[in-house]
Regions:
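NTP-dependent nucleotidyl-transfer catalytic core
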Residues: 1-179
């Protein structure tokens, strides 16, 4: 509950929450860049999920204008039953955005900014449904380019002695140790 409250504060522009968030972003980005360097990778832009938090209102407006949003238990969803998928949650009942909302904002930002031919999402296979839902919502908004341009590349998990790795449980292997 405390984490949700802080996230809501951040989404509503609370200065203390944003300062704490920025501190975490800076530390995380420094560590990510170190890992990327070990892999021989570098990026021109580092725009994390939180970069898109102020762009979610536009996503909600697009969905409202297209009559795609429905209320469900106080939350806002896009019904995807017709496509054999559960609903795509867009806004929680407290008005906060979620991953899908920010991923939609990221897609529209990236398409407008870079006019990509392909946008690849390389994530764990457990996010397969999430990206299928998000990509379908982009299509439902009349963006035919989404069918061929948005690609999810799922990967498996590294396990330790047959158990799933989890930072919360302390069962972890650091990428730097493997590399």
């Amino acid at each position: 509950d405390q984490a949700r409250a802080w996230f809501t504060k951040m989404e509503h522009g609370d200065e203390e929450a944003l300062d704490i968030w920025k501190w975490f972003v800076d530390i995380s980005l420094k560590e990510y860049k170190g890992t990327y360097a070990l892999l021989g990778m570098e990026f021109d832009h580092y725009l994390g999920e939180s970069f898109y938090r102020d762009k979610t209102a536009d996503v909600v407006k697009r969905l409202q204008d297209a009559n795609l949003l429905e209320e469900s238990q106080g939350a806002q969803i896009v019904n995807l039953e017709e496509y054999d998928m559960p609903p795509c949650l867009i806004m929680k009942k407290d008005g906060s955005s979620i991953y899908a909302t920010r991923d939609l904002a990221a897609i529209f930002y990236r398409k407008q900014r870079w006019n990509f031919d392909k946008c690849l999402y390389v994530t764990g296979q457990e996010q397969k449904l999430h990206f299928a839902q998000v990509f379908k919502v982009v299509e439902l908004l009349g963006n035919d380019w989404a069918k061929d341009s948005l690609v999810h590349i799922p990967y498996g998990l590294v396990s330790l002695e047959g158990a799933k790795l989890s930072t919360r449980s302390g069962n972890i292997i650091y990428a730097e140790d493997i590399l």
